[in-house]
Amino acid sequence: MKIKSILLCIFLLGSLTVAHAQEDASTVLQTAYTQAKKENKKVFVIFHASWCGWCKKMEKNMQSPSCKKLFDNNYVTTFLTVQESPKNKNLENPGAADLLAKYKASGVGIPFWVILDTDGTLLTDSFNSKGENLGCPATAEEVGEFVTKLKKTSKLTKAQLDVVSQVFTIKK
């Protein structure tokens, strides 16, 4: 009887974990705005998904030892999960897809990112000068446009922007 009770408890706890929904997008953003106001930073929002290799690359680059402090000193970075497969829909932040649509980015691929002020006003996004999503910038041209956007929305110096450029540019 004891074993059945223990197994039942494990099953129920496992079910609760699977059923746990993600925070809605507005809550995630409100938390980021509050922190950014306190720290005098901008909000860097990245729309991503668990299956997205370029999303993982973007996060890895931003969290690299060379870049982490540079981004952390200038931005409150937050992630909104979108475009998950049917079996992983529970990973999505409710309202994130609507927010992606608001930025006219529903069909442009991910990662898609925006940089906002503490009131939620759009300062820049990941569209390049041709209207294409930079996503995780990797070519010299993409990284150049990314760095220009960072320069306009941060206090990063030329030397610091050069570090970001080196980390993001794919070496051939």
What positions do the PLM features span?
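C-type cytochrome heme c attachment motif
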Residues: S50-K57, F112-V114
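Non-catalytic, surface beta->alpha helical segment in thiol-disulfide oxidoreductase systems
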Residues: K102-K158
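Typically the conserved alpha-helix immediately C-terminal to a functionally engaged Cys/Sec
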Residues: C55-D72
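Extracellular/periplasmic catalytic domains that process cell-envelope and extracellular macromolecules
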Residues: K37-K38, K69-D72, A105-G109
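A short beta-strand-turn-helix
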Residues: A25-V43
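Thiol-based oxidoreductase modules, predominantly thioredoxin-like and allied folds used
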Residues: D24-A25, K68-A96
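Short active-site neighborhood of thiol/selenol oxidoreductases, capturing the structured segment around
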Residues: E39-C52, T77
